[in-house]
UniProtKB/Swiss-Prot annotation:
<keyword id="KW-0699">rRNA-binding</keyword>
<dbReference type="InterPro" id="IPR000702">
    <property type="entry name" value="Ribosomal_uL6-like"/>
</dbReference>
<dbReference type="GO" id="GO:0003735">
    <property type="term" value="F:structural constituent of ribosome"/>
</dbReference>
<keyword id="KW-0694">RNA-binding</keyword>
<dbReference type="Pfam" id="PF00347">
    <property type="entry name" value="Ribosomal_L6"/>
</dbReference>
<keyword id="KW-0687">Ribonucleoprotein</keyword>
<dbReference type="GO" id="GO:0022625">
    <property type="term" value="C:cytosolic large ribosomal subunit"/>
</dbReference>
<comment type="subunit">
    <text>Part of the 50S ribosomal subunit.</text>
</comment>
<dbReference type="InterPro" id="IPR002358">
    <property type="entry name" value="Ribosomal_uL6_CS"/>
</dbReference>
<keyword id="KW-0689">Ribosomal protein</keyword>
<dbReference type="GO" id="GO:0002181">
    <property type="term" value="P:cytoplasmic translation"/>
</dbReference>
<comment type="similarity">
    <text>Belongs to the universal ribosomal protein uL6 family.</text>
</comment>
<dbReference type="InterPro" id="IPR020040">
    <property type="entry name" value="Ribosomal_uL6_a/b-dom"/>
</dbReference>
<dbReference type="InterPro" id="IPR036789">
    <property type="entry name" value="Ribosomal_uL6-like_a/b-dom_sf"/>
</dbReference>
<dbReference type="GO" id="GO:0019843">
    <property type="term" value="F:rRNA binding"/>
</dbReference>
<comment type="function">
    <text>This protein binds to the 23S rRNA, and is important in its secondary structure. It is located near the subunit interface in the base of the L7/L12 stalk, and near the tRNA binding site of the peptidyltransferase center.</text>
</comment>
<protein>
    <recommendedName>
        <fullName>Large ribosomal subunit protein uL6</fullName>
    </recommendedName>
</protein>
Length: 179
C-alpha cells in the first residue's frame, strides 16, 4: 500500500497540465517540464487535482505508484515555485565566483575548477563562500549541487571543503603524537 501514491496533487492557479497516455507536460510561470512516466501507472486529472492510479496490485506497480506521484508533484512545484540548493565553502583561501552560467571554484587545487551549468539552472555566489543553485527541475538541481560538492567534499579532520547548507560533518580526532 503506497500512502504517498494515494495523496492527490493540487494544481495551483497559473499551472496547466497536459496528459497524453504516459507522457505528462506541466507548464507554469517559471517554465515547462515534460516527463514520460513508467508503465503500470496512470495519471488522472479532474478540477484542479491530479491523482496517480496504479493499474494492478503487482509488486512493480506498487513500487512505481509512490515514485510517479512524487515525480509529478515535483514537476508541479518546480514550475510554480522552483527549487534551490545552497552550498557553503569552508577553508582558508577557498572561494567561488559565478559569471553567467559558469562557476569557478578555488578550493585548494593548483588551478581553479571551472564548471558549466546546464540550461535552466541558475547559479549565484554570495560573500564568495555561499553558492545558491536554482532551477525548476528538482533532479537536475540536486545533481548539479552534488557535482559541485564532489569537487572538494568536507574532510573530517579540519572540516574544510564544500558542504550543503546545514550539513553536519562528523569530525575525527587527530592522531596523538607520542612524547
Amino acid at each position: 500500500m503506497s500512502r504517498i501514491g494515494k495523496r492527490p496533487i493540487t494544481i495551483p492557479n497559473k499551472v496547466t497540465v497536459n496528459i497524453d497516455g504516459s507522457h505528462v507536460a506541466v507548464k507554469g510561470p517559471k517554465g515547462e517540464l515534460q516527463r514520460t512516466l513508467p508503465t503500470l501507472v496512470i495519471v488522472e486529472q479532474d478540477e484542479g487535482v491530479l491523482r496517480v492510479v496504479r493499474q494492478d496490485d503487482s509488486r512493480t506497480a506498487r513500487q512505481r505508484h509512490g515514485l510517479c506521484r512524487t515525480l509529478v508533484s515535483n514537476m508541479v512545484e518546480g514550475v510554480s515555485k522552483g527549487f534551490e540548493k545552497r552550498l557553503e565553502i569552508q577553508g582558508v583561501g577557498y572561494r567561488a565566483a559565478a559569471q553567467g552560467s559558469k562557476l569557478t571554484l578555488n578550493v585548494g587545487y593548483s588551478k581553479p575548477v571551472e564548471m558549466d551549468m546546464p540550461s535552466g539552472i541558475g547559479v549565484a555566489v554570495e560573500k564568495n563562500t555561499e553558492i545558491t543553485i536554482t532551477g525548476i527541475d528538482k533532479e537536475i538541481v540536486g545533481n548539479v549541487a552534488a557535482k559541485i560538492r564532489a569537487v572538494r567534499p568536507p574532510e573530517p579532520y579540519k572540516g574544510k571543503g564544500i558542504r550543503y547548507k546545514g550539513e553536519v560533518v562528523r569530525r575525527k580526532a587527530g592522531k596523538t603524537g607520542k612524547k
